[in-house]
Amino acid sequence: MTQYNREIFDQVMIQNYVPAQFIPVRGKGSHVWDQQGKDYIDFTSGIAVNSLGHCADEIVDVLKQQSEKLWHSSNWFTSEPTLALATKLVEKTFAERVMFVNSGAEANEAALKLARRYAVDHFGYQKSKIIAFKQSFHGRTLFTVSVGGQAKYSDGFGPKPADIVHVPFNDLAAVQAVMDENTCAVIVEPIQGESGILPASQDFLQGLRELCDQHNALLIFDEVQTGVGRTGYLYAYMKYEVVPDILTSAKALGNGFPIGAMLTTHEIAKSFAPGVHGTTFGGNPLACAVAEKVIDIISAPPFLQKIQRTSEKFMQKLQEINQQCGLFKEIRGEGLLIGAELIEQYHGRASEFVKKAADNGLMILVAGPNVLRFAPALNISEEALALGFERLAKTLHI
């Protein structure tokens, strides 16, 4: 039997990733084990994906049951799990219509295409400007990576889609300066993830809503990372009490099973008439059965309330550790999406702490070169939390 090790990755895989040296082979809850049987506490959740932990019993049961019924039938047909999930999302959010895809990038691609199509249908081709924010991240398709405000990801692929304008995040005056009647949409993350876990201010998001209303533009919330309970609310827009026209969701929606969704209103959805946009696998029964169970669990008020309590404990513990090590300039975030910015002396070295944490049996993330990112399972146990912080303190002890 072939023993697959990290060196084989370099021999057979395209090198657009540089994975860790250890290979996880099994996970349960917030524990992960590698090929050698070493135990890790997972403070990453697969980048805010496995929000119910690894191999959650309820999710495994649903997946097993659906796997014996129907896997795929294409969008020439619909399915019961697809309709059940769409119904749940409509019941629990502002949305009246849902489209399913396979990832966050696809959800954002669909949202941007819908915004442009809606503008063409109602105002003409000249209304095509998209306003986005510097250091944002919306996916890796040519359209979404161009809308994301990071040249390191978007440069080098030839001409980019036109009529995309980037302005500073949390700067309403900058948006006002470029907003006009040719703007079809503003797309924003309620919390910028890849740039360092930067929450939007209440006034900023409320101001975007008002500007969009004034200029007949659509407001798109990219909740790929903040959605499905991550902030302590089912979706972050509920915390801010600012309702978007289009919302995108993915990551935690499938708890590790690939699925994405675009949510919008009935009126806006009319612009996606039959054949205008599509997907082969979007809304497949396996993914939707899993996601419906995820929504059932996470949307329960006691579950969401516990996330907020766990968030308070997590932030408090980070502050206590920082009082001892003094490595963090700022600790910020919402719910269980938390960033700890390193002091200037350690700028550019966040990835070093990630590697050291792994050596100590802890999985953490970066959010840019200066920020450690924490996104544990929303239902992480007290035992796993305590053990994880013990290993984090060891990691940060200089």
UniProtKB/Swiss-Prot annotation:
Additional comment: May also have succinyldiaminopimelate aminotransferase activity, thus carrying out the corresponding step in lysine biosynthesis.
NCBIfam families: arg_catab_astC, argD, PRK01278.1, PRK05093.1
Cofactor binding summary note: Binds 1 pyridoxal phosphate per subunit.
Pfam families, sorted: Aminotran_3
EC numbers for this chain: 2.6.1.11
PROSITE patterns linked to this entry: AA_TRANSFER_CLASS_3 (PS00600)
Pathways per UniProt: Amino-acid biosynthesis; L-arginine biosynthesis; N(2)-acetyl-L-ornithine from L-glutamate: step 4/4
One GO term (biological process): L-arginine biosynthetic process
GO cellular component, one term: cytoplasm
InterPro entries: Ac/SucOrn_transaminase_bac, AcOrn/SuccOrn_fam, Aminotrans_3, Aminotrans_3_PPA_site, Class-III_PLP-dep_AT, PyrdxlP-dep_Trfase, PyrdxlP-dep_Trfase_major, PyrdxlP-dep_Trfase_small
SUBUNIT field: Homodimer.
Compartments it resides in: Cytoplasm
Organism: Pasteurella multocida (strain Pm70)
Positions of modified residues (N6-(pyridoxal phosphate)lysine): K251
Protein name: Acetylornithine aminotransferase
